[in-house]
């Protein structure tokens, strides 16, 4: 991928953009850029028209930035450019969060939950719920898999005798 640095003044918004960016989203874009820098390039055609990354572009402008990392896509027809714009906005929406992975990350990061795109209070509540669940489980102790099998076998024998 050929990423190049371009002045924002050379980039142009597309005629239409299917994604509307809320103030909340732009605020979170800003927090992410402040925390990590620009981690994704803006995708533009050979004329500087933005094909993907309009929200990032808006955020960089509002931050007073004058340049951005850009990936220049060349040789696409107008129809292909429109398809790229639609696909970029839709494909991400088709995924779902792996809640167990999210829980694991949140527990690992529980001392610093300032994460762009997430409400810190919600993440703290998730940590508290996990801690409370662990406390509750510890009150009852643990049973190993062998003991669970013994209990199942005993129940099955009892049910068989009752038949």
Feature map (PLM): residue ranges:
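Aromatic/glycine/proline-enriched transmembrane-helix motif characteristic
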Residues: 1-163
């Amino acid at each position: 991928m050929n990423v190049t640095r371009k002045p924002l003044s050379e980039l142009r918004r597309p005629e239409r953009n299917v994604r509307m960016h809320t103030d909340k989203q732009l605020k979170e874009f800003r927090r992410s850029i402040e925390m990590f820098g620009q981690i994704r390039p803006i995708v533009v055609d050979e004329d500087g028209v933005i094909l993907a990354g309009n929200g990032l572009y808006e955020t960089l402008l509002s931050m007073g930035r004058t340049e951005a990392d850009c990936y220049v896509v060349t040789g696409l027809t107008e129809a292909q450019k429109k398809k790229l714009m639609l696909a970029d906005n839709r494909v991400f929406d088709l995924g779902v969060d792996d809640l167990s992975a999210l829980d694991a990350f949140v527990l690992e990061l529980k001392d610093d939950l300032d994460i762009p795109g997430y409400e810190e209070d919600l993440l703290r509540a998730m940590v508290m719920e996990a801690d409370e669940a662990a406390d509750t489980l510890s009150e009852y102790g643990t049973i190993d898999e062998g003991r669970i099998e013994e209990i199942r076998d005993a129940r099955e024998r009892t049910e068989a005798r009752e038949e």
